[in-house]
Design a protein with these regions (language model features):
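N-terminal pre-domain/capping segments
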Residues: 1-103, 177, 181, 207, ...
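Active-site beta-loop-alpha junctions enriched in small/polar residues
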Residues: 6-10, 41-43, 69-72, 114-116, ...
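Gly/Pro-rich active-site loop or hairpin
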Residues: 10-20, 80-86, 122, 161-162, ...
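Active-site acidic/histidine proton-transfer and metal-coordination neighborhood
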Residues: 21-22, 78-181, 191
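Generic structural signal for well-ordered alpha-helices
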Residues: 23-28, 50-54, 95-99, 132-139, ...
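Conserved beta-strand positions in the central sheet of alpha/beta enzyme cores
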Residues: 39, 66-68, 110-111, 150, ...
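Generic structural signal for helix capping and beta-alpha/helix-loop junctions
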Residues: 47, 74-75, 119, 152, ...
Length: 270
């Protein structure tokens, strides 16, 4: 398994030379800590000069395993499930920008918060249908660009739809696209899944998983809470998973400290 960590580049407010320097500094920090890649949480990927980012990544033998898209919903309010067709179209257009970036960086594109929250108690069924229809369109765009999308079940306190593994499996069936797979996050698993059955459930769906997010029960660095990462990761290792495990936590006391602490802990069990 490979290790990465989530961060942003503040590309919306920075010149390209500043963005490239920030990425270089991240690689310089993370490579000695035995990281294999950096997962980028972006808002406007089209503002980044991909060729230069790749030059830096290659010089450190680092990958960009996945792109986070949630900022599109948080900042702009665009979502795949919105009741307004114009808003859904804007969300799909934004996803296309991520896909174009991912095509060059060989990254996966994450479908998480961008599916949005329900606008009212009367709209859930319609918004679920909107999410499915929007995702079918996104999958078609991704397939034409040879990019894989990964869908993340997220806990009910952060989003209204598809909180559990079983619900995410239903979505995959409803969308019916070979290039839509799963992202499993240890923190959301801890909050949403039945602890008596979660390991069995993970074994059953491991073949559909293409990316992992790691955070402990406190949403801090792995090893600071009581989540059983050894058992969690062993399931995927046994199933032949050789992709990325990406640290996605509250970055306190600092990004550097979380990166160091997480690597020291996880390298003992990866």
């Amino acid at each position: 398994m490979l290790l990465s960590i989530v961060t942003g580049l503040n590309e919306s407010k920075s010149r390209n030379e500043v963005i490239i320097k920030k990425f270089n500094d991240l690689c310089e920090l993370l490579k000695p800590l035995h990281y294999d890649g950096i997962e980028l949480s972006l808002l406007e990927p089209e503002k980044i000069e991909v060729r230069k980012i790749l030059e830096v990544a290659d010089s450190y033998a680092m990958k960009i395993p996945a792109l986070g898209t949630g900022a599109t919903y948080v900042r702009f309010g665009f979502s795949l499930g919105d009741m307004e067709e114009t808003i859904r179209k804007k969300a799909i257009d934004r996803i296309e920008k991520y896909i174009e970036f991912a095509r060059e960086t060989e990254s996966k594109v994450i479908i998480g918060l961008i599916r949005g929250r329900y606008k009212s108690d009367n709209s859930p069924k319609k918004e679920i249908l909107n999410i499915i229809a929007s995702l079918k369109e996104c999958c078609w765009i991704a397939q034409n660009n040879n990019v894989e999308l990964v869908f993340e079940p997220i806990n009910q306190f952060e989003i209204d739809s598809y909180n559990t593994i079983s619900q995410a499996l239903e979505l995959l069936k409803d969308v019916g696209s070979d290039n839509l797979k799963l992202l499993i996050d240890s923190y959301h698993i801890y909050l949403e899944e039945d602890p008596g059955f979660v390991w069995e459930d993970l074994e059953e769906i491991a073949h559909l998983v293409r990316h992992l997010h790691l955070a402990d029960t406190t949403r801090r660095a792995p090893g600071t809470g009581h989540f059983d990462f050894k058992s969690f990761l062993e399931i995927f290792k046994k199933k032949g998973y050789n992709g990325f495990c990406s640290i996605e936590t509250i970055m306190k006391p600092s990004f550097e400290e979380v990166a160091r602490e997480s690597s020291q802990y996880l390298r003992l069990i990866l």
